[in-house]
């Protein structure tokens, strides 16, 4: 019977066949240990010379890394095994031999591994990170479906920049100019006026010349928008959502977290509500900590975000940023017109901002005035202004960066490992 590795617990004591790749091997005298992987997990196959004979034992010892094969044998439960189960191998059929596999068990540099990303994905570590990424995506859909949100797919090609920035990838759309989307937010606002609560999940593109461990050129975002929601309503959705993601990974990816050496004691504290401080309070806190390189009105850099987050054991919301450093669609605070009704969620342990969100302006005249302040072409945004012309309501939304969230929850140092094929400032291959 053919099974997959993740089904091994159902076939203890039975002879089965598994299609797999040879991730690694070692031998000790008259026993060979084959580390097998099949995409669903990893398992050790044990080949005993006295049980299989000289010829098969010699063949097993000669197998090369990443050779594909069918392995037949009996599944045994073994608590000493890192995977919980082993196979007592009785037969091996080679499907395709692998010669001179470039990623050997020795240490390799980052550039070498990135050049071979298509092969690096096969490693134990990358398998664990991608499983956690998948769980976060799965749990995101589950959370928003449970909360009554409708999934909407905004366009990737747009005729304007949602945040009025210049960090865009330009292309031709027949005879017109077009851009790769930085965010689906404006389209999601339109959808919220039709369906109430909506969310999207898709790729976004930022032509930022940044080489930090937090930045990718192409990354994925979850972007919900909610009609009749004020800022505090949105913050409650955000903290419940992030707590839900962490719990899902703890419940369903404990083996992967262990494999990555993640200290789960940090994650077990991620229960809503999360702390909130204003931007002004954050600036004051930084000054108390000795940071003299930032004044009110500046945006935070990575060291500032890390210092603020270090004061808390959970993600922290920084609210009410200066109007001058935030996009045009964020409304002023009625009690202080120098700040806007917005918040960023900063993850602990130095992972930085994972969510940015705000209330949205729903008054037409106010929106037009803000667009003038930002020197935006109102004709290009005519459809967006229609939302305020025809029955708009108070509404809020946010965007969660998937790769940063995966990096934080998995304890991965650099976001380049949290997406299958990362696009970085100087990397478009493979």
Swiss-Prot record:
Alphabetized UniProt keyword annotations: Aminoacyl-tRNA synthetase, ATP-binding, Cytoplasm, Ligase, Nucleotide-binding, Protein biosynthesis
Known partners and oligomeric status: Homodimer.
Enzyme superclass (EC): ligase
Descriptive protein name: Asparagine--tRNA ligase
Lineage: Bacteria, Bacillati, Bacillota, Bacilli, Bacillales
Gene label: asnS
Record PROSITE patterns: AA_TRNA_LIGASE_II
Main location: cytoplasm
E.C. number(s) listed in UniProt: 6.1.1.22
Catalytic activity of the protein: tRNA(Asn) + L-asparagine + ATP = L-asparaginyl-tRNA(Asn) + AMP + diphosphate + H(+)
Family: Belongs to the class-II aminoacyl-tRNA synthetase family.
Entry-linked PANTHER family: ASPARAGINE--TRNA LIGASE, MITOCHONDRIAL-RELATED, ASPARTYL/LYSYL-TRNA SYNTHETASE
Segments passing through the bilayer: none
GO biological process, one term: asparaginyl-tRNA aminoacylation
Location relative to the cell: Cytoplasm
Pfam families: tRNA-synt_2, tRNA_anti-codon
InterPro entries: Aa-tRNA-synt_II (IPR004364), aa-tRNA-synth_II (IPR006195), aa-tRNA-synth_II/BPL/LPL (IPR045864), Asn-tRNA-ligase (IPR004522), Asp/Asn-tRNA-synth_IIb (IPR002312), NA-bd_OB-fold (IPR012340), NA-bd_OB_tRNA (IPR004365)
SUPFAM superfamilies cross-referenced by the UniProt entry: Class II aaRS and biotin synthetases, Nucleic acid-binding proteins
Listed GO MF terms: asparagine-tRNA ligase activity; ATP binding; catalytic activity, acting on a protein; nucleic acid binding; transferase activity
Gene Ontology CC annotations of this record: cytoplasm
HAMAP family, per the entry: Asn_tRNA_synth
């Amino acid at each position: 019977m053919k099974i997959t590795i993740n089904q091994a617990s159902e076939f203890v004591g039975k002879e089965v066949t598994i299609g797999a790749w040879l991730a690694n091997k070692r031998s000790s005298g008259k026993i060979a240990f084959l580390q097998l992987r099949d995409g669903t997990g990893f398992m050790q196959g044990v080949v005993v010379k006295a049980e299989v004979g000289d010829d098969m034992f010699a063949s097993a010892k000669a197998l090369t890394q990443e050779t594909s094969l069918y392995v037949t044998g009996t599944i045994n439960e073994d608590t000493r095994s890192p995977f919980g189960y082993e196979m007592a191998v009785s037969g091996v059929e080679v499907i395709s031999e692998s010669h001179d596999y470039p990623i050997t068990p020795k240490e390799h540099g980052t550039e070498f591994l990135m050049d071979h990303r298509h092969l690096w994905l096969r490693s134990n570590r990358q398998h664990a990170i991608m499983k956690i990424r998948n769980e976060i995506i799965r749990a995101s859909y589950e959370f928003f479906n449970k909360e009554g949100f409708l999934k909407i797919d905004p366009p990737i090609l747009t005729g304007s920049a949602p945040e009025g920035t210049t960090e865009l990838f330009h292309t031709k759309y027949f005879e017109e100019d077009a851009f790769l989307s930085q965010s689906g937010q404006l389209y999601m606002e339109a959808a919220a006026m039709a369906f109430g609560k909506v969310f999207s999940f898709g790729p976004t593109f930022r032509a930022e010349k940044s080489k930090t461990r937090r930045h990718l050129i192409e990354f994925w975002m979850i972007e919900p928008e909610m009609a009749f929601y004020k800022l505090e309503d949105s913050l409650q959705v955000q903290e419940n959502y992030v707590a839900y993601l962490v719990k899902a990974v703890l419940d369903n990816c404990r083996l992967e977290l262990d494999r990555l050496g993640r200290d789960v004691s940090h994650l077990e504290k991620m229960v809503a509500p999360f702390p909130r401080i204003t931007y002004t309070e954050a600036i004051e806190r930084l000054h108390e900590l000795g940071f003299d390189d930032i004044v009110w009105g500046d945006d935070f850099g990575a060291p500032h975000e890390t210092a603020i987050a270090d004061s808390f054991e959970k993600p922290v919301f920084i609210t009410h940023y200066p109007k001058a450093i935030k996009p045009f669609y964020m409304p002023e605070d009625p009690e202080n017109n120098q700040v806007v009704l917005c918040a960023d969620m900063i993850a602990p342990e130095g992972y930085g901002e994972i969510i940015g969100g705000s209330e949205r302006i729903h008054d037409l005249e106010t929106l037009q005035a803000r667009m003038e302040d930002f020197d935006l072409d109102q004709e290009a945004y005519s459809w967006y202004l229609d939302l305020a012309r025809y029955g708009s309501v108070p509404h809020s939304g946010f965007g969660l960066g998937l790769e940063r969230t995966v990096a934080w929850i998995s304890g991965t140092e650099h976001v380049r490992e949290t997406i299958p094929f990362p696009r970085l400032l100087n990397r478009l291959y493979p």
